From Swiss-Prot:
GO molecular function, one term: shikimate 3-dehydrogenase (NADP+) activity
Cited Gene3D superfamilies: Leucine Dehydrogenase, chain A, domain 1 (3.40.50.10860), NAD(P)-binding Rossmann-like Domain (3.40.50.720)
Subunit description: Homodimer.
Keyword Amino-acid biosynthesis (UniProt): yes
Protein name, entry field: Shikimate dehydrogenase (NADP(+))
Name of the gene this protein is made from: aroE
Length: 258
C-alpha cells in the first residue's frame, strides 16, 4: 500500500480523502490518501521523508501552492506558466509538479455547460488559485479578465503586465461581469461568516463561482442566488482535479515511477 495525500494548513475539513479513497477502493488501486496539516517550517522534513514514508504523490492546497515550487525538479505545463502547483508526482529521483486545478476548473465549466468565450470575468484574489483560474479563462477565450486583490501592488508582481488589477475596495461596478470567481478562502470553512466582496448589483444571469465547497453555499453564493445569479461551488472542480491527479500518479508508475 502506497501513501498519497494533501498538504496544507488548517485543512481537516477537506473532502479529498473521501474522494480519493473511494476511487482507490472501487478501482483496486493500492493507494491510501490522508491529510498532512503542515506548518511552513515542517515542509522541509515532509519532502525529505517522502520515500521513507512510501509517499508516491501528493496534492497541495492553501497556502503552499507557490511555496512548493522550490522543491520540484520539473514543472509541467501549464503549472510552469501559472506559477502554482497543486499536484506532485514522486518519482525515484525527482519531484514533478502539475496543476490539475486548471483541468478541474475547465471540466467543471463543461459539466455545467458554461461557455465563457467573450465573457467579462472578475477574479477575486491573487494567490495560486487565482493565477490558475486566470490562465484557464484566458485559454477559454474570455473577452476580458479583471482581478481584484487586497494588495494590488503585490498582485501585479504575479501576473502578466497587461492584466487589469484593482484594489478589492475600489471595484463596485459588478454589473459589467458575466462571471465572478472567488479564489480566496473567505467564505470557506475557516471564514464561514465572511464574504470576499459585496454583490450589490450583478447581471441577472451572471455566473458566480466560489472555489470553496464547504459550506455548500457560502454567504457569497447565497447573496448571489438572491440576486438571480447561477451559482457554483468548488465541489465538481475538486472531484475532477482529484481524478486527474490520480491518473498522473498511476501514469508515473505505482512502483515508484520511471
Amino acid at each position: 500500500m502506497y501513501t498519497t495525500g494533501l498538504i496544507g494548513k488548517n485543512i481537516n475539513y477537506s473532502e479529498s480523502p473521501e474522494i480519493h479513497n473511494n476511487y482507490y477502493k472501487k478501482n483496486n488501486i493500492p493507494f491510501f490518501y490522508k491529510i498532512f496539516n503542515l506548518k511552513q517550517d515542517q515542509i522541509d522534513d515532509f519532502i525529505k521523508n517522502l520515500h521513507k514514508n512510501n509517499i508516491k504523490g501528493f496534492n497541495v492546497t492553501i497556502p503552499y501552492k507557490e511555496t512548493i515550487l522550490q522543491y520540484l525538479n520539473d514543472i509541467v505545463y501549464p503549472a510552469d506558466k501559472i506559477g502554482a502547483v497543486n499536484t506532485v508526482a514522486v518519482q525515484e529521483d525527482k519531484l514533478i509538479g502539475y496543476n490539475t486545478d486548471y483541468i478541474g476548473f475547465i471540466k467543471s465549466l463543461q459539466y455545467y455547460n458554461i461557455q465563457v468565450k467573450n465573457f467579462k470575468c472578475l477574479i477575486i484574489g491573487s494567490g495560486g488559485s487565482a493565477k490558475c483560474i486566470y490562465y484557464a479563462l484566458k485559454e477559454l477565450n474570455a473577452r476580458d479578465i479583471c482581478i481584484v486583490s487586497r494588495n494590488p501592488e503585490k498582485a501585479r508582481l504575479k501576473f502578466e503586465e497587461k492584466v487589469k488589477i484593482l484594489n478589492i475596495k475600489d471595484e463596485n461596478k459588478l454589473d459589467r461581469y458575466d462571471l465572478i470567481v472567488n479564489c480566496t478562502p473567505i467564505g470557506g470553512p475557516n471564514f464561514k461568516e465572511q464574504k470576499p466582496i459585496e454583490l450589490k448589483e450583478i447581471k441577472k444571469n451572471c455566473v458566480v463561482y466560489d472555489l470553496n465547497y464547504t459550506p455548500k453555499r457560502s454567504k457569497l453564493l447565497k447573496e448571489a442566488k438572491e440576486n438571480g445569479a447561477f451559482i457554483i461551488n468548488g465541489e465538481k472542480m475538486l472531484i475532477f482535479q482529484a481524478y486527474s491527479a490520480i491518473g498522473l500518479w498511476c501514469l508515473n508508475g505505482i512502483k515508484g515511477g520511471r
